Regions:
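S-adenosyl-L-methionine
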Residues: 1-138, 143-144, 207, 271-275
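Glycine-rich adenosyl-binding loop in Rossmann-like folds that engage adenosine-containing cofactors
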Residues: 72-100, 155, 160-209
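Conserved acidic-Pro-Pro-aromatic motif
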Residues: 106-107, 202-275
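Hydrophobic pocket-lining residues within nucleotide cofactor-binding pockets
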Residues: 113, 164-166, 200, 219, ...
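Hydrophobic packing residues within well-ordered alpha-helices of enzyme cores
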Residues: 122, 145, 173, 226-230, ...
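Short alpha-helix adjacent to the SAM-binding motif of class I
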Residues: 140-151, 253
């Protein structure tokens, strides 16, 4: 059963990447090496070990310009094109719950925008009457985010080079093996970058926003301080929330805290949806 599911997932990845134009050979080679490594390395965290093989081969950070079925043109590193593109575009994360898919006229906050996949997809969905505010603290990711927004002429996107927290200032951003999985919360030995911090409340005030319809969070274990730094916004505007749990603390604390703010919270397959 498990082997059948794994083979089905592999086939779906190849099918999806076959539907995308640009650097197809590079992407298929990346996928093939990843899955071959995953099958051979049968001890420890096989996912992380397979990624380590690709990093040692110098493939994870190679960039590819991709032509997506909806007309977006995105430049992504190969790791991001494998790890994030498929689940976001196939609706596997952030929008599988009814009512959480960005709609025309919505204002969307993208926390942990990385290289802009969700940001650009949401910007097309909300249209010229809507707006997307994208937060990304890591300098190289932010440059790609900006380039992708500009390349697609998405004038309804505001980019913010900062991590979202419960205070204004600076903090160390720790680098991890997962090419774009940088974290304020989880220390590592791979490196550190000093980044700016902002809050949801400050951003909403500075932009003069009277509505925020959806907040998507992918910030590697930092959701608690990020949401606490936006408590006024959450109480006043009640945006929908979609996030993946990244720590046991988030699983323990966030559902009850959000219910205390009047949210209806649903937890499914490691994801939290609140409205």
């Amino acid at each position: 059963m498990r082997a059948g599911r794994a083979l089905s997932n592999i086939a779906e990845q190849y099918r999806f990447h076959a539907s995308i134009g640009g650097a197809r050979l590079q992407r298929w080679l990346y996928l093939s090496i990843y899955y071959a490594s995953w099958l051979v390395l049968r001890w420890g965290d096989r996912h992380t070990r397979a990624l380590a093989v690709l990093r040692c081969l110098g493939m994870s950070d190679r960039r590819a310009l991709l032509n997506l079925p909806d007309g977006l043109l995105l430049e992504l590193d190969l790791y991001t094109s494998y790890d994030a593109l498929y689940p976001i575009y196939e609706g596997r994360i952030y929008a599988p719950e009814p009512g959480f898919e960005p709609k025309s006229g919505w204002v969307v906050f993208d926390l942990g925008a990385q290289q802009g996949i969700f940001t650009c997809k949401a910007a097309k969905a909300v249209g010229t009457q809507g707006r997307v505010v994208a937060f990304e603290p890591h300098p190289s990711n932010f440059r790609l985010l900006k380039e992708n927004v500009d390349r697609n002429e998405l004038r309804n996107v505001t980019t913010v080079e900062a991590a979202v927290a419960d205070r204004i200032g600076e903090a160390d951003l720790y680098l991890h093996l997962h090419s774009t999985g940088y974290s304020l919360a989880r220390k590592s030995t791979l490196g550190v970058v000093r980044v700016s911090l902002t809050t949801l409340d400050k951003t909403a005030e500075e932009l003069g926003l009277q509505r925020v319809d959806l907040i998507k969070l992918d910030i590697e274990g930092s959701a608690i301080p990020a949401l606490r730094g936006g408590e006024r916004l959450l109480r006043r505007l009640k945006p929908k929330l979609a996030m993946e749990f990244e720590s046991d603390r988030e699983r323990r604390e966030l559902p009850d805290w959000l219910r205390g703010l009047g949210y209806n919270v649903r937890v499914t397959a490691g994801y939290l949806y609140a409205d």
